[in-house]
Amino acid sequence: MGEPAGVAGTMESPFSPGLFHRLDEDWDSALFAELGYFTDTDELQLEAANETYENNFDNLDFDLDLMPWESDIWDINNQICTVKDIKAEPQPLSPASSSYSVSSPRSVDSYSSTQHVPEELDLSSSSQMSPLSLYGENSNSLSSAEPLKEDKPVTGPRNKTENGLTPKKKIQVNSKPSIQPKPLLLPAAPKTQTNSSVPAKTIIIQTVPTLMPLAKQQPIISLQPAPTKGQTVLLSQPTVVQLQAPGVLPSAQPVLAVAGGVTQLPNHVVNVVPAPSANSPVNGKLSVTKPVLQSTMRNVGSDIAVLRRQQRMIKNRESACQSRKKKKEYMLGLEARLKAALSENEQLKKENGTLKRQLDEVVSENQRLKVPSPKRRVVCVMIVLAFIILNYGPMSMLEQDSRRMNPSVSPANQRRHLLGFSAKEAQDTSDGIIQKNSYRYDHSVSNDKALMVLTEEPLLYIPPPPCQPLINTTESLRLNHELRGWVHRHEVERTKSRRMTNNQQKTRILQGALEQGSNSQLMAVQYTETTSSISRNSGSELQVYYASPRSYQDFFEAIRRRGDTFYVVSFRRDHLLLPATTHNKTTRPKMSIVLPAININENVINGQDYEVMMQIDCQVMDTRILHIKSSSVPPYLRDQQRNQTNTFFGSPPAATEATHVVSTIPESLQ
């Protein structure tokens, strides 16, 4: 066998501008050009010499649409020839056929939408030359126009062959613009089709990027018509052609080698019709079409390069557009993020400024409120000292002032003594007091605890705290009852003095008083208001004075009368005052008042031998000097006060002393 020389080439795009020109060319030339493009002529000649079997191509119908190509011989202007109807009449194939293995190359470019056309087609025969044998690449001379013209009457639809055989079928090459992106692939394992419903054995050839040799076990290949649509080629054989992996051809049997090309094959269908006889003179005509195939491969290669360049440009543009689009989207996203970050930054700056201002205000306020601890301690110490001075200071200061004010007090005034009522002593004492003190009692405190009389209020007077000892309620009620009874008995005495002539009425009143106050030594006597006044010439020692309430209103205001206090008012100056011999600084001074009272029962106590007196024990809450206007004093008490003052400070009258009068204000007027 000679060295196989595969013609590597690809078909141009179905959208080539010369695709639809020269549609009326000879179908024989187009068929041979196509076969020369796919096969190696040396292999075909060697196989045809050894071919011993006769093949029957009557039922061969290779219905496949192929891509158009350019022919320099048929058209000087390099126009593309497209053949619509091509008839091939090969010799009849041998009936004894075996399984073949046909492998088709797969698509190389994933982005291309057309199928790759195999670059090499090897057909070999063991016994005799096949009618479809082609020349090899070594014959570079171009065939003349006469053999080309002779092919037309032999294989044309209007002429007969030399043996009188007529073609039965036509091979139609139709260019279709539709592109199938995904080829169908068969597995490499052999498959035997035994279904009785299929009239003939079939194989499917698809494109692969490399050469896929066939395991040649039969000398002749029988092709059957394939479906009009799709990317598969169906070959009719007694057995199914098996797909095998690429490798070395094992035998010298006729081989159909399909080399993977670059150009993609569209959905074209080629119908190969076998000839009824094996004596068809095809060998001479096949040699004529060889230069046409060689000349067209160069143009196809250049077109493929241009097509690849255009595809690369399109891909580059598409990738550039996508990159620009992605970059634009990325930039837009960055701008949006930048705007959001700037706005958030501004907001955080504002919040930070607000917080700083608030912090400054709080710090300044703390600085203002902070006071050093030494100042606080000094203030506390000063407050404590002030309380101590106010509590203990004034008493000692007053005592020292009183001693300084009275340095020339006579020893007689510094001793404990009792006031007498003798005319001479009273006059001497009163004259001395008037001359020294200008008829006023000075504020003095004796060393031997004599009676203290306040003539004026001190500059800093602090009232003592109120004394609230534990007082029994029953005892309080008893004391109140005794005081009220003492006042009422004076009123009863006044009533008796009005009715001196009526002794019987006096006896009834005393008996009634004894019945009401039998449990008490002093009895409270109920009284009734009387509008009549008591005569001044009455001989009774006690006289209850009744007057209009209006005459006492000014007097009550002058003495600051309170409703919860008993008042004993005396305008006489001949009272017997007994000072306290001891003094307790922790308690209030106590005072006992002894005043005339009415005897409860004259049978028990003899009125001639005993004086009935009321003793009132109390604690001194407060002492002060009052200046009462003379006009506010009742008229009767005013005259009585004038008389008693003259008697107290002057010589005793020649006549008998005036009777003592104790005036009692009724409870109703109080």
UniProtKB/Swiss-Prot annotation:
Instruction: Give residue spans on the Lumenal membrane side.
Output: 399-670
Family annotation (InterPro entries)? ATF_bZIP_TF, bZIP, bZIP_sf
Question: Segment Disordered: which positions?
Answer: 91-183
GO CC terms, sorted: chromatin; cytosol; endoplasmic reticulum; endoplasmic reticulum membrane; Golgi apparatus; Golgi membrane; membrane; nuclear envelope
Give the recorded effect for residue 474 to I: Loss of glycosylation at Asn-472 and increase of Golgi translocation rate
Do the record's keywords include Cytoplasm? no
Location in chain, cross-link Glycyl lysine isopeptide (Lys-Gly) (interchain with G-Cter in SUMO2): 87
Region Leucine-zipper: which residues? Answer: 348-355
- Residues covered by region (Interaction with THBS4): 468-589
Segments forming domain bZIP: 306-369
Highest rank taxon of the organism: Eukaryota
Q: How is it modified after translation?
A: During unfolded protein response, a fragment of approximately 50 kDa containing the cytoplasmic transcription factor domain is released by proteolysis. The cleavage seems to be performed sequentially by site-1 (MBTPS1, S1P) and site-2 (MBTPS2, S2P) proteases.
Which BP terms from GO are recorded?
ATF6-mediated unfolded protein response; endoplasmic reticulum unfolded protein response; ERAD pathway; eye development; positive regulation of apoptotic process; positive regulation of ATF6-mediated unfolded protein response; positive regulation of autophagy; positive regulation of transcription by RNA polymerase II
Query: Which PROSITE patterns is this protein grouped with?
Result: BZIP, BZIP_BASIC
Q: Which residues are glycosylated?
A: 472, 584, 643
Q: Where in the cell is it found?
A: Endoplasmic reticulum membrane; Golgi apparatus membrane
Reported impact of residue 324 to C: In ACHM7; reduced ATF6-mediated unfolded protein response
UniProt site positions, description: Cleavage: 419-420
Q: How does it sit in the membrane?
A: Single-pass type II membrane protein
Assigned protein family: Belongs to the bZIP family. ATF subfamily.
Q: How does it assemble?
A: Interacts with XBP1 isoform 2; the interaction occurs in a ER stress-dependent manner. Interacts with LACC1.
The domain comment in this protein's record states: The basic domain functions as a nuclear localization signal. The basic leucine-zipper domain is sufficient for association with the NF-Y trimer and binding to ERSE.
- Name of this chain's protein: Cyclic AMP-dependent transcription factor ATF-6 alpha
What organism, scientifically named, is this protein from? Homo sapiens (Human)
